[in-house]
Amino acid sequence: MSLGSRTFRSKRQMAAFEKSLQGRYLKLLRRNPFLFYGVPFCTLMAVGSYCLSDFTAVKYEREDKKVRSVQEDELVKLRANRRTVDLKEEFYRLQGLADQDWEPVRVPRLPGESENVWDVE
């Protein structure tokens, strides 16, 4: 028969152990396993989140720099390539009046190709 990781203590040694700091701590752990598992886990998550926030901040700062540099380049191009705006021209363009100069023309079919006409009676 094996005792495993537990050590054998006499009654006097056990009473002294229970009065010591280590004994009181182990007694609390047996009653409240949250102190042993929950508190360290929550602490680890909070500290880890705080430490990793620097890495995520660097990531977003890089993205901001890329966007800012692209915007500056595009701004220079836009200022250089501006076109003059005529109010009437824009009105007709938006109305689509210039696109109505067409006629529907049927595409000639190849020899032997069906006309795809549906006889609905």
From Swiss-Prot:
Protein's membrane topology: Single-pass membrane protein
Gene Ontology biological process: mitochondrial cytochrome c oxidase assembly
Subcellular location: Mitochondrion inner membrane
Signal sequence coordinates: none
Assigned GO CC terms: mitochondrial inner membrane
Family affiliation: Belongs to the COX16 family.
Protein name: Cytochrome c oxidase assembly protein COX16, mitochondrial
Organism, scientific name: Eremothecium gossypii (strain ATCC 10895 / CBS 109.51 / FGSC 9923 / NRRL Y-1056)
Primary gene name: COX16
